[in-house]
Amino acid sequence: MTDQNPFAASDRDRRAIWEILVRRDSDFFLSGNWSLVEGDYLDEGFLGIDAGGNSDASRWTIGFPTLAAYRQAALDSRLNQADFAEDLRTAWFRCQSLQKIDIGGDIGLAHKRIEGAIRRTTGPALELSWRSLFFMRRVQAGWKICGFVGYLPL
């Protein structure tokens, strides 16, 4: 995938969700600037489930019981451009896709895949291989992330 939104301008809901989950999320993850995505989340009731690469739901855990916990974990896992032998933003976009977004009324379910490799300056490439399901809610201000199940196996 590139940084070009694949959804038509006429598909406003999916286009907006893609902007939240791909463009802004990537820009935040690569910069560490939380203010880029701060308004994209519903704080009250937020929940992030960590599947830990396991398809057996009985082994999933409450990885991020609050938005603050998720924010800190995301900041702690930020990648550093100096560690990579290719442009990190281009590579990150190449390794992700978000082509399926189900919408029912004011609820959305987005299926995001992270899959590929990013060359490091030394050592083996960073291998990426997981998918996440994002739960979205439409409120007066637009679409917001209210939770997710992350690190699911492909």
Task: List the model feature ranges, each with a label.
Residues A8-R12, T61, G123:
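Charge-dense, low-complexity intrinsically disordered segments
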Residues C95-I101, I114-G116, R131-R137, G150:
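Hydrophobic/aromatic beta-strand elements that line small-molecule binding cavities or substrate pockets
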